[in-house]
């Protein structure tokens, strides 16, 4: 009517071909109805995204597991549903990594292709020899050129991550004791013996490594570093940082990806989180910052503070 077209959510009403102009698949339950054009936004909700890890999955994914457009699958969007109160409009763009996500999906939808859907390698860059890594590293280089050339003065928090390499242990069972000490604290090795069992070490690349994704409990979980992460376990991750000179630098560190649509509480002062996480640099323990948010009542009407990097 009046030249307007209607887009409806899927899942939603069970439309038949000819009853609606287009549908947006917003949930993992969404499936194409033949004869209706669809937009794919499954797991594209940037308000749940980590700045680094989720961008890998977003760039590498096939649109609805297809390599090119069809009559029934015509494109894709990122969705930003920020349910927490905001102190400034700029924070909505910055906290949800909007511009990097926009550029990643714009290139993917323009080129088509991709090597996986969200349930392939997920958010992981395992090693430099894979096509996934090479393609993402090339995109990252182009994106950072755009950041310097076209996004000066805009809230664009992303920095290079393809040079960040980690060694991460298998998770040790802690029996609910989050302060329990395990062999990696005595010295770093390629593997560890603990209570008659061997615990290995694997490598991963990136500035954000999920041990368990926010969508990890869904029937179609997004894969992370651990295939089947369990509660009451302790893991160790370590990396090498080189400085060509003695200097003071800032540090971007977080142990939890704060969704901007949940009522998560800030950590208690003097702690990194509610899981007993700890950080060291050259064997010197790093204390957490003073958290700017101090509320103890869960609410979407209280803005996130500096606990949300």
List where the protein language model places each region.
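Aromatic-lined ligand-binding clefts that engage carbohydrates, nucleic acids, or primary amines
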Residues: 240-283, 309
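Short hydrophobic beta-strand segments in globular cytosolic domains
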Residues: 285-287
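Carbohydrate-binding surfaces of carbohydrate-active enzymes
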Residues: 5, 12, 88, 101, ...
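Short beta-strands within extracellular/lumenal beta-sheet-rich domains
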Residues: 226-243, 300
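Aromatic-lined glycan-binding groove of carbohydrate-active enzymes
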Residues: 26-84, 96-97
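Active-site neighborhood of glycoside hydrolase catalytic domains
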Residues: 1-21, 28
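Short, surface-exposed tryptophan/glycine-enriched loops
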Residues: 293-309
């Amino acid at each position: 009517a009046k030249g307007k077209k209607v887009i409806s959510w899927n899942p939603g009403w069970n439309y038949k071909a000819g009853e609606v102009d287009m549908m947006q698949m917003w949930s993992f339950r969404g499936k194409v109805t033949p004869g209706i054009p669809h937009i794919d936004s499954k797991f594209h909700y940037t308000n749940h995204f980590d700045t680094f890890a989720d961008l890998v999955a977003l760039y590498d994914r096939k649109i609805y597991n297809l390599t090119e457009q069809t009559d029934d699958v015509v494109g894709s969007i990122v969705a930003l549903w920020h349910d927490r109160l905001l102190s400034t409009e700029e924070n909505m763009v910055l906290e949800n990594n909007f511009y990097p996500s926009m550029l990643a999906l714009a290139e993917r939808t323009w080129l088509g292709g991709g090597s996986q859907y969200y349930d392939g390698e997920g958010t992981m860059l395992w090693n430099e020899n894979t096509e996934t890594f090479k393609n993402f590293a090339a995109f990252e280089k182009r994106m950072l050129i755009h950041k310097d050339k076209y996004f000066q003065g805009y809230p664009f928090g992303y920095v290079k991550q393809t040079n960040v390499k980690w060694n991460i242990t298998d998770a040790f069972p802690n029996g609910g004791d989050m302060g329990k000490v395990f062999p990696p604290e005595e010295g770093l090795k390629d593997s560890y013996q603990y209570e008659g069992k061997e615990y290995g070490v694997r490598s991963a690349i990136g500035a954000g490594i999920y041990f368990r994704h926010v969508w990890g409990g869904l029937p179609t979980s997004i894969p992370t570093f651990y295939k089947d992460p369990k509660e009451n376990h302790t893991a160790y991750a370590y990396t090498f940082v080189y400085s060509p000179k003695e200097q003071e630098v800032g540090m971007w560190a977080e142990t939890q990806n704060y969704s901007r649509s949940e009522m998560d509480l800030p950590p208690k002062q003097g702690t990194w989180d509610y899981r007993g996480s700890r950080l060291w640099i050259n064997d010197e323990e790093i204390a957490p910052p003073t958290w700017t948010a101090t509320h103890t009542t869960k609410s979407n009407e209280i803005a996130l503070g500096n606990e949300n990097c």
